[in-house]
Amino acid sequence: QLLLVVTFDAVVTSAAALLLVSAGVRFALFVPVGVALGVVPRVPDRHAVDRAWTFARWSVPDQILDRFSYNMPVFVLGVVGTPAAVGIYEAADRFADFGATISWRLSSPLLTKVSGDVAAGNGYDTYLRGAVTGGTGATFVVFGYLIGAHDVVARIAFADARWAFSTTVLLVGGVNVLRGFWTLTSHAMEGLGKPSVSFRTKLYGLVASVPITALFGAEFGAVAGAVGYGVMNLVVFGAVCHYARDVFGYVPVDAETVAHLTLGGLVAASLTASVVAVATGTPLPTPGVAAAAAVAGLGGFSAVLLAVSPPTRVAAHRVVAMVWGRGGRTP
């Protein structure tokens, strides 16, 4: 797709043209692959249609709410706020969202793994806690980095609105720890055939949070968007924990792993702040300071976990195995 877009740059000048390129590439690839694999389309029987409808009637709306919940502050601020507020929130979200994005990427393999194990009659309890908790690990190090370097990041992204940007990026980065957890847990519940539960948790979060951003977005801008985002994630987190007890019989959190990740995040924040304090007084440019702080924070975080956390190492191994194995056996 990228090659075609670059090659025909003069022709691909609209969103419609870009969508056509994407659809054309997929069609050109999927059809030959299907033929090569011997896939023969056929009309599904009534049982297959009933099963598909039972799952899709909740799964499709759930995916829509999932995307809307992620972009809710941008949508609402776009209506009640200013373009500057939208821009500040978008930029802060890009910096703070790296850890939650990794959790989101892990959620599909986790869904597949849980669904496959249940269908095969295999247990999933041995890895669920570690996979969910370990999958949120990146959010801890990102938040630790932002605690120590938010002012440097603000000077890079929005030098004219440093307070608004710093506040927004810290709120979003902090609450993404919860988002990482509930994203993975809700997908695991969906893998057990419970997409309606995942749908309801997001709906509760949106009902509680949209009015906050809508009412205060015009006055407080991006910060109101971040507060609304935080309230939404707190509500969804609480609802997911509540439903997890019914679905799994427990909340899939490894307390020891959380403690070690928290310790690693604190070390990352301390090292990041120290590097920023030292490097700011040198000729190193601001992006260089931010990069040096990131290396120090990530190094400290990794060193702590390698030194004190065997459960975290096991959890990381399971996460990697889950991603690369795509449903294969995990330890």
PLM regions: where:
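Hydrophobic alpha-helical transmembrane segments in multi-pass integral membrane proteins
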Residues: D62-Q63, R67, F143-G148, V210-A214, ...
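Hydrophobic alpha-helical transmembrane segments
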Residues: Q1-V39, E90-A96, G221-A244, A292-V304
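Interfacial/gating helices of multi-pass transporter permease domains
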Residues: A15-A16, D50-F55, S59, M72-D97, ...
